[in-house]
Amino acid sequence: MQGGTPEAVKLGRWSRDFYLGQRAEIGTDSGFTRQGYLLPCFSEAEVAAAHDRIAMQQAEGIPVRWAGPDEVSELNPTMAPGVTLGASYCAEDGYITPPRNVAAYTAALLGTGVHVAERTAFTGLDGTDVRTSRGTISAGLVILTGGPKLAAVGALAGIRIPAGGARHQVAVTEVHPAFADTPMVFHLPAGLYWRPEEGGLLFGMSNPDEPPGEDRSVDEPYLAQMRARLAKLVPLTADLRLRRVWAATIDFTPDHLPIIGPALDRDRVFVASAGGAGMMWGPAVARATADVALTGASEITDVSMLGLDRFDESGRSRLAADPIALPFPEKTT
């Protein structure tokens, strides 16, 4: 819930509440683990920015607070003592299990009679008729999604969408009992985060110099660089083997904010993008887009500023970028 703007905070809070009540609502859950979330600071400028964010987040009703260096060590004993100047902390935050999340949604869709068309390519739109590799689907309303492929999806529909994708790497260490009850941590300046996973520690990283693209090979030199950085912060990891390492394509928008709203100059066609925060904002972005498509507005937050009309012809946004984001490329292509 520790977003960098009021809109991001509201999207994050709604998504967290959805995860908490997901089983009661749709009969499946995404394995949400409420274990807290730390954003450590390493400079006085970061401390000042954190206090400003905390004030904004508290005004939005989020139970976030400042934790000094000693308390950070208490909250996460695996971190090197005295390595930070403190951190923003919210005990109500947590994380989900991505594979379980996908399985949960799929089961819920199938259980309500939705036909999931796998291995079916989208090829374009005729009004709200959806052309696919298996024929045309007549629809009264269309919502375009696609994650890192969203710009390509938009191009097939004749719609310019400033969204991109870049390589993101994740690794999981071997098991160590010290990680079991530790909160998730996001080292914002380094684009490095970590949390417990299957008895070990999962850590993910995005290279700020990574160009947009679909490279899903593991960048071994950058992985080594991030492992060295992680070892300074979490010394236990220095001697732990890696059980799994993979790379994937993560989506992003130029201002690190979601896209929610109608396609420009199209009737009954809408666009939804979580802007690189799919697990944190995904449920709220989906609901808000559905709300806008059906009623013109959403009770989650005012999304009128999050539409495609905030971007100019070059894809530049008139909004300030959300400061709580991975270091995505400056341009989408």
What are these regions (language model features)?
Residues 68-69, 118-120, 244:
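Short loop/edge segments at beta-strand edges and connector loops
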Residues 1-75, 191-192, 211, 229-231:
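Dinucleotide-binding Rossmann-like beta1-alpha1 core, especially the glycine-rich loop
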Residues 175-268:
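Active-site lid/adjacent beta-loop-alpha segment flanking the redox-cofactor pocket in flavoenzymes
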Residues 33-37, 166-167, 245:
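Short Gly/Ser/Thr- and Asp/Glu-enriched loop/turn motifs at secondary-structure junctions
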Residues 136-181:
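Central helical "cap/lid" subdomain
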Residues 83, 88-141:
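Helical element adjacent to the flavin cofactor pocket in flavoenzyme catalytic cores
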Residues 10, 41-49, 89-107, 217-224, ...:
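Short beta-strand to alpha-helix junction loop
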Residues 231-333:
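C-terminal catalytic lobe of FAD-dependent flavoproteins
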